[in-house]
């Protein structure tokens, strides 16, 4: 005991000395007038002065501070800057101290934003450090403006990087260049191991240097890192080259930029293990031709971008219309030099001492001999997609320009990212910059000297891809579809409001091809759009047929189907193999969510999907309309007979006022555990007769655990009727009840609470009361909630009921 006592004495002596020194310095600067110790201008307390002195000299005293007793350390923690506060976290936990309140206060004072009410923050330290990293990277915070953020001994980016799980890149790729710079090499290495999600928001057009930095960043974070999810948000006018770069890198393809330093990690990996030819063919899809059209198209873009970046000048939009024959002749004339440009020596992008893998020469030779193989390939060896619409020249480029010289072909190649397939004769004109999915005459485009992606290196790829409000042009949609066909590592795909149009058929074909790949992991698909060329139920049937191993399917179409005009070339309607009438095979769906447009839906089509989904556990129908209550009853009967594993059923924004017998049928189902009727107008007709029948059905159901009734105009009378579900003679095991937005007043809620107390059923779980009229009598509402909290967990809000005036008038 002598040692701890001695240390405690020394620590107290140190505190007194530091405090005395600080007070002496303070007294010299202070006014000579004395102030009361309790006044507003009183000097800081002794312990606070001591803490300030200690925090100012943490570089020397850090180890000693860590050894301080818990009570002393607890007073010093709020005075530390963020770097030492982060470093002392483990020691504080061992002493039974928590820093969460300090980090929360730092968030409120420095970040000055309020987290979303839907967000549950489990660690304020990690949240603060992640946000701090992003602000420093973008230059939106000045670390010198606050002593808690400034310390010359620490790098803000490096110190906070290990807490970053999600990184957002915005606008003109701000931050990408800084992260790949040599001074931040350790920062990038730390991010590669900590970062899981990479997001792009509101991207704008960027220069060549920024895109080259992005290429290196994606290579490090995805190919050599732990990033498993890439999400793109709100990109109204996507830049095709940048979008396809992000896609191809996310899919695992890599071609280093010209003149860039060799990748050290690539060199280490190649020395450790060389990929086999079998592995490469598996990743690229062994069931498809070795030179898949999409891979060739994406490789064309990547190769041409490398050529453009080597010249460090922006792409010039073509202004000449050339014939197919002149295009082929010009490209063939410069084929030898072009191949040399597109295939730089290995030393330009491999680490010194790296041995070439056995598969590398084969891949290179296959690409370099593409011209001769094209001549031998039959015209039917590649699929023949329909011609796609042309794109206009870039603004500001007028007149025709004849390109000559050995470098002219490569400038044209930038715009020949995709070559229109299926044109008739050599004399037809095509505009450079036109996009398509095949080669000339639908054959191999290697006659243009473009390498297949087999010549690119293949690395790890992401497992989750999300595109929110990113309109997909034809070439972008085509590239996505063809990459998807071999993206076996992809587990979840979200396409939300991308304007796919008729490209949905290509998407279905690519998903079908992906499903046939060995090792396909796609288990979740979320698809939503304003319009669809297929009715939503036909689209659902097609997806389920294409992906029988899918577990989660969420599909939503906001407006009725508008089939494309058959008179327009390329829009001749859906292929027969997509909308076939054959029976849907058994699938593995466990969760199905459907959002319907206006108009009655054919119940037999929905029933056919449900019959094939015997493993379905959760079904959600949003805005579904049926021709008659009998059709709705047919759907419910199908659920009872074929979906025995169904546990959760949800209906939202559906008029079920005339389907009361069907609702009672559901409440008597002894397999369902949770039912949701959200804004379904349940009690609009015959409430006096229907409510007792509904309560009786629920009292006899012992398996139902949750009932959600938001937005059904339940009112006080309906709430008091529901209270009978918890009476002594009830066998109900209901433990979650949602009665939000139901015109409930404080007096009705108080009577409901008293009935629960009288029956003494004990705590039954959660009660949600959002957006009810509880502000009309705040005292009564507080008393009701106090009583309810003795019975259940109550979740409510302070809502202005005057917003519900229209709803009130409708119930008068």
From Swiss-Prot:
Record-linked InterPro entries: Leu_rpt_41 (IPR026137), LRR_dom_sf (IPR032675)
Region (Interaction with Elongin BC complex), start-end ranges: 45-54
Residues bearing PTM Phosphothreonine: 327
Basic residues bias spans: 387-401
Keywords assigned: Leucine-rich repeat, Phosphoprotein, Repeat, Ubl conjugation pathway
GO biological process, one term: protein ubiquitination
Chain positions covered by the region annotation Disordered: 268-408
LRR repeat ranges, renumbered to this chain: 487-507, 518-530, 531-555, 613-635, 636-659, 701-728, 731-752
Residues bearing PTM Phosphoserine: 155, 276, 326, 357, 373
Residue ranges with Low complexity bias: 354-381
One Gene Ontology cellular component annotation held by this UniProt entry: nucleus
Domain of life (superkingdom): Eukaryota
Assembly notes: Part of an E3 ubiquitin-protein ligase complex with Elongin BC (ELOB and ELOC), RBX1 and CUL5. Component of a probable ECS(LRRC41) complex which contains CUL5, RNF7/RBX2, Elongin BC and LRRC41. Interacts with CUL5, RNF7, ELOB and ELOC.
Record text about domains: The Elongin BC complex binding domain is also known as BC-box with the consensus [APST]-L-x(3)-C-x(3)-[AILV].
Name of the protein in its database record: Leucine-rich repeat-containing protein 41
